[in-house]
């Protein structure tokens, strides 16, 4: 299976504190991978390293089989962040303008849209079912609708890999399920590789097929099915430890003074 992302023994620290230690994992072509972990686990740092925002201090990262340092074809990667709502009522922009801004990796800024660009915009909006909102101001849309537009912005360059960083932050509960179902459909119908950075266990349990759990180091790396068994085993271990502590307390209470 072709590897889209390969991370080998990557470590990173801020000052003297380790953010990541000897991280290693692979993301296969066509997979829907969930990168999970608690706050402060290093998820955001790992994402910044993959995207080249931070420079690794140890180990290696490859994208589409190339060393990250040599990788130039960033048009292959679409990105949706939890802060995509930078386009809002304070900076008015139409849905069309927001989606078109995703073409800058191909065209640069302030380039006139040609027919192919317009076809790509139409394709992206159709994929997220937002074609009727083409000329609406982005600030007028709900949180869920805005995130659909930002996915369209990431899709407009027709990437092979879509990376999403906590994409449902600020999205109402009613729209979260529809949002993840859209991602699953992209993965299924277009064989798009997805890397979802999240702490949403519902999404992990329901939609992804590959789970990577980190807490400054690799905690788990395997299929979603294997992860369910891992969680069940951990729960049993926690219950057993709780019982041992309760028994120890009972023994203490029963001891003569």
From Swiss-Prot:
Keyword Zinc: yes
Role description: Involved in a zinc uptake transport system.
Protein name (database record): Zinc uptake system ATP-binding protein ZurA
Pfam families linked to this entry: ABC_tran (PF00005)
Organism listed in the record: Listeria monocytogenes serovar 1/2a (strain ATCC BAA-679 / EGD-e)
Entry annotated with the keyword ATP-binding: yes
PANTHER family from the UniProt entry: METAL TRANSPORT SYSTEM ATP-BINDING PROTEIN TM_0124-RELATED (PTHR42734:SF17)
One cellular component (GO) term of this entry: ATP-binding cassette (ABC) transporter complex
Family in the record: Belongs to the ABC transporter superfamily.
Cited InterPro entries: AAA+_ATPase, ABC_transporter-like_ATP-bd, ABC_transporter-like_CS, Metal_Ion_Import_ABC, P-loop_NTPase
Keywords: ATP-binding, Nucleotide-binding, Transport, Zinc
Every ABC transporter domain range: 5-241
Entry-linked PROSITE patterns: ABC_TRANSPORTER_1, ABC_TRANSPORTER_2
């Amino acid at each position: 299976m072709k590897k889209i992302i390969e991370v080998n023994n990557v470590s990173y620290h801020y000052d003297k504190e380790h953010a990541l230690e000897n991280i290693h994992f692979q993301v296969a072509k066509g997979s829907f991978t969930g990168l999970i972990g608690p706050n402060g686990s290093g998820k955001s740092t790992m994402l910044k390293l993959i995207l080249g925002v931070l420079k690794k201090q140890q180990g290696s990262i490859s994208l589409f089989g190339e060393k990250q340092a040599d990788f130039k074809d960033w048009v292959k990667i679409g990105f949706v962040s939890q802060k995509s709502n930078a386009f809002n009522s304070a900076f008015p922009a139409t849905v069309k303008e927001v989606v078109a801004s995703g073409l800058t990796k191909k065209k640069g800024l302030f380039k006139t849209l040609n027919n192919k660009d317009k076809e790509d915009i139409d394709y992206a909006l159709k994929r997220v079912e937002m074609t009727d909102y083409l000329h609406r101001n982005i600030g007028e849309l709900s949180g869920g609708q805005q995130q659909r537009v930002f996915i369209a912005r990431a899709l407009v360059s027709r990437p092979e890999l879509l990376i999403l960083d906590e994409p449902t932050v600020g999205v109402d509960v009613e729209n979260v399920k529809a949002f993840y179902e859209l991602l699953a459909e992209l993965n299924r119908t277009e064989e798009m590789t997805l890397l979802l950075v999240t702490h949403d266990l519902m999404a992990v349990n329901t939609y992804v097929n590959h789970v990577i759990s980190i807490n400054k180091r690799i905690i788990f790396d395997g299929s979603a099915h294997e992860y369910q068994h891992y969680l069940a085993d951990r729960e049993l271990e926690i219950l057993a430890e709780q019982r041992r502590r309760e028994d120890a307390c009972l023994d203490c209470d029963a001891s003569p003074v």
